[in-house]
C-alpha cells in the first residue's frame, strides 16, 4: 500500500497541520540543542512555498497530561522558528475549537500533551484536531512508534493524511538498510543491557550477515562464552539467550564475535585508570568498560567488508576518553566505508558528534525508540495509519 507524500500534493490555499518532533531541550526559555528544529525546517518551508496556511504541533518534555505548565511551553520553539523562517510565526494556546491562520503564516500549537487524552489517542480529541485542517502531515519519525492523538488518531479523521519529507526520508533509508540491503549486512548493537535490546538482537540475527555486540550487552556474551566478567554489568539470567543467539548466527554461516581483549578498571569514574587485558585474564574485581585494540581492529575489518551498516549503540563507555578508543575505531571504520550506513539512537548520535563523522554516515536517524522498533521488525502505528489512508 502506498503512502501519500506531502511533496506530491497541491497545497495552495489549504490549511495544513504538520506533526513535527520539536521536543528539544530548553534552558531559561532558550532552546539549547536545535538539531530537531533544523531537521523540521525544510518541511515547514516546503508547505509555505506550496502556498499553504501552516499549523505545526509537537510535544515538549513530559508535563502532566491535561495541565498547562509554562516550563513545557512551546514558546521557546516559536521564538526559534520566528528567526529561522522568513514569515510570521505565533503561538496558539487555545486552538481545539478553531484557529485563524492565513496563507504564508505559521501557527505553532501549544504543547499537545497539555490536552487530556493525547497519550491515549482519544477519539474526540483526534477528531477536533482533524477538523482544523484540510491536510494532515505526519513528519515526526521520533514519535511514529506511539499511537497518540497527534501522531495517529488525527490522521485517521483528517480529510487527507500524508507523510512529510523527513518521515519519508527516514522510511526510505531504513527500508534501504533492512528490506533490500547491499550485502554483507553488518549490524552493530551496543548499549548496557541485553534485556532492552533482546527483540532487536533476535530480529536482526535473522537478517544480517554479521551481528556485532558492544557495551554492557557484550559482557553477557563474554560470560556466555565461559569467561569471567568480574564486577562488570551483565545479565546472568540471559546467558542461555546469548548462547542461543550465537548458535542461530552460526547456523546461518555468521557469528557474534566475542572480544579477545578488553579495557578494564576498578571503578566507574571519569578518572578511573584503564588497564588492557586479554578477555581470559579479567579478574574478579575488574569492570569491563571498552573493547581492546585487537578486538576493535577485528570489528573494523568486518565493517570494511560490509555492503550495508546499521549502527545502534557504542561499544564502550566512550563518554570517558580512556574507555572510548573502541567506539572511536568503529566510528572511523564506518566513516571510511563506502557502504550505505545508517546510525540511530541517542548514545550513537552522541558518538557520531564526538568523533565528528556526521557527514560520513549515509543517514542519521532522528528517532530513538522508533528506530529500535523498526529494527525489531514492528510496523510503526503512524506508518500503519498512513498506509491505511493512502489505500
Swiss-Prot record:
Record-listed substrate binding positions: 21-23, 36, 59-62, 113, 146
Entry EC number(s): 2.7.2.3
Keyword annotations from UniProtKB, A to Z: ATP-binding, Cytoplasm, Glycolysis, Kinase, Nucleotide-binding, Transferase
GO annotation (BP), single: glycolytic process
GO cellular component: cytosol
Catalytic activity: (2R)-3-phosphoglycerate + ATP = (2R)-3-phospho-glyceroyl phosphate + ADP
A single GO molecular function term of this UniProt record: ATP binding
Pathway: Carbohydrate degradation; glycolysis; pyruvate from D-glyceraldehyde 3-phosphate: step 2/5
Main subcellular location: cytoplasm
Positions annotated to bind ATP: 197, 319, 345-348
Record localization: Cytoplasm
PANTHER family per record: PHOSPHOGLYCERATE KINASE, PHOSPHOGLYCERATE KINASE 1, CHLOROPLASTIC-RELATED
Record family assignment: Belongs to the phosphoglycerate kinase family.
Quaternary structure and partners: Monomer.
Protein known as: Phosphoglycerate kinase
Amino acid at each position: 500500500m502506498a503512502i501519500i507524500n506531502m511533496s506530491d500534493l497541491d497545497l495552495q490555499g489549504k490549511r495544513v497541520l504538520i506533526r513535527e518532533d520539536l521536543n528539544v531541550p530548553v534552558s531559561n526559555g532558550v532552546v539549547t540543542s536545535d538539531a530537531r528544529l533544523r531537521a523540521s525546517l525544510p518541511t515547514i518551508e516546503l508547505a509555505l512555498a506550496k502556498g499553504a496556511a501552516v499549523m505545526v504541533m509537537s510535544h515538549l518534555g513530559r508535563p502532566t497530561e491535561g495541565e498547562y505548565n509554562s516550563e513545557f511551553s512551546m514558546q521557546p520553539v516559536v521564538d526559534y522558528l520566528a528567526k529561522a523562517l522568513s514569515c510570521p510565526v505565533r503561538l496558539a494556546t487555545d486552538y481545539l475549537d478553531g484557529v485563524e491562520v492565513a496563507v504564508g503564516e505559521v501557527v505553532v500549537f501549544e504543547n499537545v500533551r497539555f490536552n487530556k487524552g493525547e497519550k491515549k489517542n482519544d477519539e474526540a480529541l483526534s477528531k477536533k484536531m482533524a477538523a482544523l485542517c484540510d491536510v494532515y502531515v505526519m513528519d515526526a519519525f521520533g514519535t511514529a512508534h506511539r499511537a497518540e492523538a497527534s501522531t495517529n488518531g488525527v490522521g485517521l479523521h483528517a480529510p487527507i493524511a500524508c507523510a512529510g519529507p523527513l518521515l519519508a526520508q527516514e522510511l526510505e533509508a531504513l527500508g534501504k538498510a533492512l528490506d533490500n540491503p547491499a550485502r554483507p549486512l553488518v549490524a552493530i548493537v551496543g548499549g548496557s543491557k541485553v534485556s532492552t535490546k533482546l527483540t532487536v538482537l533476535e530480529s536482526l540475527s535473522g537478517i544480517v550477515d554479521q551481528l556485532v555486540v558492544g557495551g554492557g550487552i557484550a559482557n553477557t556474551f563474554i560470560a556466555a562464552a565461559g569467561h569471567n566478567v568480574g564486577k562488570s554489568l551483565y545479565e546472568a539470567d540471559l546467558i542461555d539467550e546469548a548462547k542461543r543467539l550465537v548458535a542461530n548466527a552460526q547456523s546461518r554461516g555468521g557469528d557474534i564475535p566475542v572480544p579477545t581483549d578488553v579495557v578494564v578498571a576498578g571503578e566507574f569514574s571519569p578518572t578511573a585508570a584503564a588497564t588492557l587485558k586479554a578477555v581470559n585474564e579479567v579478574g574478579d574485581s575488574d569492570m569491563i568498560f571498552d573493547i581492546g585494540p585487537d578486538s576493535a581492529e577485528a570489528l573494523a575489518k568486518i565493517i570494511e567488508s560490509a555492503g550495508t551498516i546499521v549502527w545502534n549503540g557504542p561499544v564502550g563507555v566512550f563518554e570517558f576518553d580512556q574507555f572510548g578508543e573502541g567506539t572511536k575505531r568503529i566510528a572511523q571504520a564506518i566513516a571510511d566505508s563506502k557502504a550505505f550506513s545508517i546510525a540511530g539512537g541517542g548514545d550513537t548520535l552522541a558518538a557520531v558528534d564526538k568523533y565528528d563523522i556526521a557527514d560520513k554516515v549515509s543517514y542519521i536517524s532522528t528517532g530513538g525508540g522508533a528506530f529500535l522498533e523498526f529494527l525489531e521488525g514492528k510496523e510503526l502505528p503512524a506508518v500503519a495509519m498512513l498506509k491505511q489512508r493512502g489505500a
